[in-house]
């Protein structure tokens, strides 16, 4: 198993942490509980959890609240839960969980521009946690692919003059506000 997949869930005494949003099933033997995570993240902003088995045990469920997900909310069985968590923290719900409980985490995603370090007018386009890219053609690609050889991270192909590179003109806010995800589009 990939090292990262072992970090989807972490248990600590009476607390279950959810760190990654991946369709999965967790059986917590000590608590006699099974939790199922259903998601199409990042194509959908909603992550659903379902308690399949439970002996009505109390514990805290901590859902990671990513820094990009401003305005995230969580509900249990359709009722929105109050939380004081900020982006970059965990949304915490403490209760006695029972079979059939449904938890829904909504994490709104929007287009954001992240300035490239040391480059005043260069930005990366983000949609939630995803860095966006655009196909720009496949001709004249010799020497532009990286590989794992010594120095393979350096492109050895023809350099394209900056004035020939496609550019977007406007302020970061005006450019960001002009980009939208069409309903039904996949990332």
Where are these regions (language model features)?
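Single conserved hydrophobic/aromatic residue that forms the stacking wall/gate
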Residues: 1-9
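Edge strands and adjacent loops of beta-rich recognition modules
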Residues: 10-53, 62
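Beta-strand-rich binding/interaction modules
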Residues: 56-76
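C-terminal beta-strand-rich structural cap/linker in extracellular carbohydrate-active enzymes
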Residues: 59-62, 93-108
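Solvent-exposed beta-strand/loop surfaces of large extracellular or lumenal domains
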Residues: 69-94, 113-120
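Glycine/proline-rich low-complexity spacer/linker segments in large multi-domain proteins
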Residues: 107-185
């Amino acid at each position: 198993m990939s090292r990262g997949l072992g970090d989807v869930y972490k248990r600590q005494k009476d607390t279950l942490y959810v760190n990654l949003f991946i369709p999965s099933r967790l059986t917590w033997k000590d608590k006699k509980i099974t939790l199922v995570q259903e998601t199409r993240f990042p194509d959908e902003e909603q992550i659903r959890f379902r308690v399949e088995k439970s002996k009505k045990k109390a514990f805290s469920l901590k859902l990671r609240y990513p820094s990009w997900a401003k305005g995230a909310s969580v509900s249990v069985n359709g009722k929105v839960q109050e939380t004081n968590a900020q982006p970059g923290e965990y949304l915490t719900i403490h209760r006695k969980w029972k079979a059939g409980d449904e938890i829904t985490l909504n994490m709104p995603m929007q287009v954001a521009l992240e300035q490239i370090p040391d480059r005043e007018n260069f930005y990366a386009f983000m949609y939630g946690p995803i860095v966006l890219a655009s196909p720009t053609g496949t001709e004249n690609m010799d020497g532009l692919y990286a590989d794992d050889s010594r120095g393979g991270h350096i492109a050895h192909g023809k350099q394209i003059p900056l004035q020939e590179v496609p550019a977007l003109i406007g302020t970061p806010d005006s450019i960001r506000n002009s980009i939208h995800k069409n309903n039904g589009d996949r990332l």
